[in-house]
Structures are given as C-alpha cells and as structure tokens.
Amino acid sequence: MSPWKKSVLTAFIPQAIKAIVKDEIKDAKLSSLFADHSLMHPKDKKIVLFSVPGAFTPTCSAKHLPGFLTYASAFKEKKVDEIVCLSVNDPFVMKAWCDANKAGNDILFLADGNASLSKAMGLTFDGSMYSLGVRSQRFAMILTGLKVEKLFIEKPGVFDVSSAQKVLGHLS
C-alpha cells in the first residue's frame, strides 16, 4: 500500500499533455497514484480547475485555495464532480499544502512540476526575478469532459476573476 493517503491524491502531469486546442484539452494523460480517480476518466465529468502560481505563496494560501475550500459543497450542489488545484510545484509540496489546509477529499491537488500543462496552454510567466522560475498564471476553468466551457485568466498580480465565488457564479 502506498504511504499516500487515498484522500490526498497527487499526480504528475507528463510531457504528453499537448495543449488546449479549439477549447479542448488534447491528450490530457495523467498518471496518478490512484488509478480509480475521476480525472483518469474525465468523459462527461464536470471539473473546475484552478491554477495558482505556487503552493504556500501569500495570495494562493490566504485567498485562492481557502475560497475553493469554503465553497466546495456549493460546487458539489452545482453538480461539479471534481475541484482541481494545479500548481507548478512537485507532488510532495502539493501534498504538504493539501495537508496543511486540511483539504481532505474536497480538492484534488495536481503538481505541474515542469510546467508542462501550463506551458502547453500558454499560461505561464517568468517569476525568476522573485526566485520562482517559470510559474503558472493564476486562472480557473470550467470543463465538461475535456472541453473548456469557461476560462478565467487573471491579469498579472491580480486576484479577482478566478476566485471561487466568481467561478461559482458562472455555473448553472
């Protein structure tokens, strides 16, 4: 048995992820520690994915993640099958961030360690001047299967349109 708790799934996002092309994520192959997870079979699943520049960073830890934790049950009421948090960190950092925030089964934490998915979507920025390297921009998206229904991209240094409350307001 893996030392990872089943409630805390971390995953690698391999180089096989190509891009969002015509509003659909193509070849989104996730290798995870738990093969039975819904993201392994996303067809017909409603997924809310939000991306943060980094685990344990100020805005991500104080505002972005807590909003999705607070409204997790409201997302489930809106028939969202999975809430996913993506960050350019390694899976061990993502697990520690999940544990530190007592996220349990509410949010799936995915590590985009080499920024493969973020780069493929064209949603990265260079944080080298802050000793962060390449990071994902702050954004959120609503997906049905792998089709992107809505995409909310933040301007640099801003936290607004990708908040849990704003995303929740776009779900019918």
Residue spans of the language-model regions?
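Chalcogenol-based redox active-site neighborhoods
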Residues: 1-172
